[in-house]
Amino acid sequence: KHKLFLMIRRPPRSTLSIDRRQRQMCIRDRTWLGGDVALVRSMPNTPALIQSAASVLYATPQVNASQREKAESLLRAVGLTQWVDDEALMDAVTALSGSGPAYFFLVMEAMEDAAKTLGLPEETARLLTLQTAFGAARMALESSDSSATLRSKVTSPGGTTERAVAVLEEGGIRALFQRTLAAARDRSIEISTDLGAR
């Protein structure tokens, strides 16, 4: 794991920390920054590699509007940015968008495997899965409708999608994702606590 501390400008000095594991008090105590520094924590995710990140930022009270904008502009270069006012929410952010790409990769992997058992060639199963995921994500991004509304629009009564979605619901997909995100959040808290104790 790599840590990046970027000095934005002086005066007053401010620092952007891209290290999902360390809370701001830990960063101050373990570095030369000191207790009065204006600190912004950020949690980007791996799609930053293709300028498609979902990055969340948290600022300490010492950060002024200009410093917030400079920090955000750095992260906007690699994708979407959002702010949270409570640093504790960074653990939930880690669980959702930080670890989230792996969840989608797993779902796509499972869909590809299922398609192959139905007889589709491996490459066809892969491409159809990827394009379907891309198309659904793009529709959701470009629509003002909620995910639930979009789902209902493609779920015809008595049709194939309705039956398929019923299987997912009966299998407890919502509870499964609740446990999934809670497990990731709890692990994020454990890691931060462990680092703070060292």
Descriptions of predicted regions:
Residues K1-R23, I27:
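Single conserved hydrophobic/aromatic residue that forms the stacking wall/gate
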Residues D29-R30, A164:
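Hydrophobic packing residues within well-ordered alpha-helices of enzyme cores
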Residues V40-V56:
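Active-site capping/gating segments
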Residues T31-A38, A54-A92, F105-S144, R187:
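Internal alpha-helical scaffold of NAD(P)-dependent oxidoreductase catalytic cores
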Residues D91-A102, R151:
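A short glycine-threonine-serine/GTX helix/turn-capping micro-motif
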Residues L130-R198:
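NAD(P)-dependent Rossmann-like dehydrogenase/reductase catalytic/cofactor-binding core
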Residues L96, M108, D194:
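Catalytic, metal-anchored helix/loop core of enzyme active sites in primary metabolism
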